[in-house]
């Protein structure tokens, strides 16, 4: 899960690459420079606090959302094995600037959720968090019963996001809100 105003998960270390401490990272980011540009990053093992690590280099595997990265001090396969399943994080206050119509996923948290019923917009809940480990899912708390539901963040189900006016519209398939 992503917690607003703290950390953003941008990738997962999936496995080692070779014998010199390189690692494969599955990207969850649209910004490739997070895996290519040298500098400080943060790694997090399961429920531990994030720790700083320096990215030395990286390159993208052709045709995949996988990057091969090299961190300072990780020089053997044995060292690299210890980092498998770690999350690669960035601080959410260091997010890149976007174009006018674009937004960061973190900006979806706390938006009102509306549906169109009988040609009228009805507020049904709010986005309380995101699930982003495999798919982009909105975690929405419904006002009528405080139930939490997962909504896939795809154009067919979430056709409109209005960050400026603090709401989004969902068009859920029948039964999705009752699960």
Swiss-Prot record:
Tell me the compartments it is located in.
Cytoplasm
Q: Name one GO cellular component term.
A: cytoplasm
The family this protein is said to belong to: Belongs to the RimM family.
Task: Name the predominant localization.
Answer: cytoplasm
Q: How does it assemble?
A: Binds ribosomal protein uS19.
Q: GO molecular-function annotation terms?
A: ribosome binding
* Keyword vocabulary terms for this entry: Chaperone, Cytoplasm, Ribosome biogenesis, rRNA processing
Q: What name goes with this protein?
A: Ribosome maturation factor RimM
Domain of life the protein comes from: Bacteria
> Which Gene Ontology BP annotations are present?
ribosomal small subunit biogenesis; rRNA processing
Q: What is known of its domains?
A: The PRC barrel domain binds ribosomal protein uS19.
One Pfam family assigned to this protein is RimM
Name its species.
Prochlorococcus marinus (strain AS9601)
Q: What sequence ranges are listed for the domain PRC barrel?
A: 100-176
PANTHER family from the entry? Answer: RIBOSOME MATURATION FACTOR RIMM (PTHR33692:SF1)
**What's this protein's function?**
An accessory protein needed during the final step in the assembly of 30S ribosomal subunit, possibly for assembly of the head region. Essential for efficient processing of 16S rRNA. May be needed both before and after RbfA during the maturation of 16S rRNA. It has affinity for free ribosomal 30S subunits but not for 70S ribosomes.
Is rRNA processing one of the keywords?
yes
